[in-house]
Amino acid sequence: MLTQPSIKYRPAQIIDFPARTWPSKQLKTPPRWCSTDLRDGNQALANPMDHVKKMAFFKHLIECGFKEIEVAFPAASQTDFDFVRLLIEGKHIPDDVTIQVMTQSRVDLIERTIQSLVGAKKAIVHIYNATAPVFREIVFCQDKPATLELAVQGVKHIRQLCEQYPDTQWTLQYSPETFCFTEPDFALEVCEAAAKTWQPSLERPMILNLPTTVEVNTPNVFADQIEHFITSFSSLENITISVHPHNDRGTGVATAEMAILAGAQRVEGCLFGNGERTGNVDLVTLAMNLYSQGVYPNLDFSDMRRTVELVEECNELPVHPRHPYAGALAFTAFSGSHQDAIKKGFASQKSTSSMIWQIPYLPLDPKDIGCTYEEVIRVNSQSGKSGAAWLLQENHGLFLPRKLQIDFSKKVKNHTDQTGHEMPLADVWRLFRESYRLNPDDKGQMKLMDYRSHSSNGLQEIRATLRYQEKTWQLVGEGKGLLSAMLDALRKRFNWQINISDFHEHTLGQQTKSKAVSYVQIESDQATPSFGVAIDEDSTKASLQALINACHPLYKEA
């Protein structure tokens, strides 16, 4: 890299537009959406889609709610031409969906394009030519009048051909390619001339599509360009202002959002930002950004995973794990502090009647797009006490007491430090069961076989039968409750100097016949404090077994 890049690169020009109003506005309504996956996205693929993939993609776009879909560049290849004919002749286009095709401003290409659309109920013909100085002077060797005339003659020819097919509802879309670095006055002049030639009406509307063909400036500058264009245009009756942002500077989404604030009514782009170079604007992120602000985008990504899988299969490109909303890690927290905040957020959400989503680190509810909460918190060496506790709570209904959370997190961290890898839910559950003797079929575990109790002189007396490996013991104890009576019995039988330092219990589920889970921590002169957990349909038996399980480190003394 150059230490003085200014000797090679010049900053893009900005426009002086103090009358801007867009910065104080909010996004309250969705734009019209146009997917260009089958044209702009497809032309950027190393292996362009065949008809089977294109049809699957087309149908999925319709399922997601797209009403305008750019399907081909018919004059570019026989494959594209045939696909348009397949859609029309096969009656694959719903009545409320309009297909769009693209053409350059050349007579032969325009004629081929219109031929591909014969029989369509509705169609958008998208014509473009480059208008920026670097393209006029270097690529096409044209001056401004020649560039303007190319646009006018192309629109004129399209109009003449469309008039031959009155059964189709025609819409013209004109794009001054490279609009974002075209002189504002010249871009306005060319678009005015195109509109004057087309003469838009209610029956024959027009779209002016203003692209950031290559991103060269910050999103606020493009927003100024859009608002300046809109306020300067002579008449926008029956004309829709559309934008087509690219992502060369990584700000395609912000560019589109600010353009909408500035007055754009329509956005073209691709799912997950496919397209030439760094791609087009990502329509999924745009739509979900609106959704997370309480605005229904008129697109449905309720099954985000299915959308990801289809796009990956058709494009032969992966969706990045960190991709907003759609990536495999989009909602995942490994950090202990993040996990703790999320866990507390869910607990707060459950304790209130408010439907407003307020969960730290999660801009929307993953379930709204078909994800599970299992994907939210995952456990590795960076995780704290809340991560594993959350997984056990959400997947097994266990609400671990704080002391047990801390104890188990140490065991988890020791495991992940040793392996150096993420610890999946199945391994977390296995480690928990092994650590706190939640394995009723384990022969190395002391089990409560049966017990009887009765009250005498204000005390509870318990008679219990325990089995450990091949040994069986009969125990007798008394206390103010059955748990303290069992504690007394264990002390007497095994001479253990133990005390219960923590005890919690709750039901698993909301049903009357739900099982109970008990958590017991003991302290002993003979061993470090330890925990036991037990689950049983009998809540009393669960608490007694949990106490017995907590004594596991002392079994060698028995």
From Swiss-Prot:
Gene Ontology molecular function terms on file: 2-isopropylmalate synthase activity; acetyl-CoA C-acetyltransferase activity; magnesium ion binding
Enzyme Commission code(s) on record: 2.3.3.13
Domain Pyruvate carboxyltransferase: 31-305
Pathway: Amino-acid biosynthesis; L-leucine biosynthesis; L-leucine from 3-methyl-2-oxobutanoate: step 1/4
First and last residue of the signal peptide: none
InterPro entries cross-referenced by the UniProt entry: 2-isopropylmalate_synth_dimer, AIPM/Hcit_synth_CS, Aldolase_TIM, IPM_Synthase, LeuA-like_post-cat, LeuA_allosteric_dom_sf, LeuA_N_DRE-TIM, PYR_CT
Annotated function: Catalyzes the condensation of the acetyl group of acetyl-CoA with 3-methyl-2-oxobutanoate (2-ketoisovalerate) to form 3-carboxy-3-hydroxy-4-methylpentanoate (2-isopropylmalate).
Subunit structure: Homodimer.
The name this protein goes by in its record: 2-isopropylmalate synthase
Record organism: Marinomonas sp. (strain MWYL1)
